[in-house]
Design a protein with these regions (language model features):
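The feature marks the mature, well-folded catalytic cores of soluble enzymes
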Residues: 1-293
């Protein structure tokens, strides 16, 4: 099978990304759209291209087969964050329903690409449901947690559960806080990054007590991200194999805590492609095949 991704730590075999040359297009487009999309700064287009090449190289050196989502005139800068518009189940792709109007066309571009490589579409979330990939955390192959907040709502989670059917045993709804409001992106994965089946990186101050305790009761060790490294996206880390990950450089405390747990850490410069648009290495990638083999 050329797809299947109901876990977040087994070896990354196939991943879909979108290069900034296609998502950003040029500096003029970046200048215009970054304010519209509430970016914290205006990305430098040329530096973004160079930094993304380094990020792509890390993915390829991990052994992943890297696929590129083509450019599309209907999409905006945020289309670089390919994790959000769809979810890959063992039954096919589930197309999400995005909250922001600038991202509404993105699931359709995912659908076209996956169909072109013969990956089935299991279904789609429809209004009034909302669901974004950044809110979905696979605890194991048959257990998935979904953040319920401003980006994914109860109706979206209900539809997701219905589409998955017998592919899972449990879908856990995790309430998210208001934090900085509906115009700022907060996903469940803003606060949780699986590093191994029994090791998660977390920012506990934004986790519900019940969900945090649930993880502990499952025997998962929680590594805490310090306050000073939360805004620099220290909690957004992509596992490419168990205990081998990619993270944004400039989070030395978090990196040290990972390395103390025998985690191999690779870093990249996220100043343009991650920090200004609030999308770390998990956001930049849509894994669509992980394998235990």
């Amino acid at each position: 099978m050329n797809f299947g991704c109901q876990n977040m730590v087994d070896p990354l075999c196939k991943v879909l990304i979108k290069h900034p040359r296609d998502a950003y297009q040029n500096q003029t487009t970046v200048n215009h759209q970054s304010t519209q999309l509430n970016y914290t700064g205006v990305p430098n287009f040329e530096k973004a291209l160079a930094d993304y090449e380094s990020f792509k190289d890390l993915l390829e050196s991990s052994g992943a087969d890297v696929h590129f989502l083509p450019g599309d005139e209907s999409t905006f800068l945020d289309s670089i964050y390919t994790h959000d518009p769809c979810i890959i189940s063992n039954g096919g792709a589930i197309l999400c329903a995005m909250r922001e109007k600038e991202r509404l066309s993105e699931p359709g571009t995912m659908e076209a690409y996956f169909k072109s490589i013969n990956i089935p579409i299991l279904g789609r979330i429809i209004s009034p449901g909302m669901l974004e990939g950044g809110d979905v955390v696979w605890i194991d192959e048959y257990t998935v947690a979904v953040g319920e907040g401003y980006r994914s709502n109860a109706e979206g989670i209900r539809q997701f559960r219905e589409l998955l059917g017998k592919l899972v045993n449990e879908v856990i709804s995790v309430p998210l806080p208001h934090w900085n409001g509906p115009d700022r992106c907060l996903h469940l994965m803003s606060n949780v990054s699986p590093i191994d089946h029994d090791l998660y990186l977390v920012y506990s101050r934004l986790l519900p007590v019940s969900f945090r305790q649930y993880l502990i009761n499952r025997g998962i060790k929680l590594l805490e991200v310090p306050d000073e490294e939360y805004n620099s996206m220290g909690c957004n880390v992509l596992a490419v194999t168990p205990r081998k990950c990619i993270m944004i450089e400039g989070n030395p405390v978090t990196q040290g805590r990972l390395e103390a747990e025998k985690v191999k850490v690779h870093t990249y410069d996220g100043s343009e492609i991650s920090l200004k648009g609030a999308g770390g290495p998990t956001c930049l990638t849509r894994p669509f095949l992980r394998s235990t083999a």
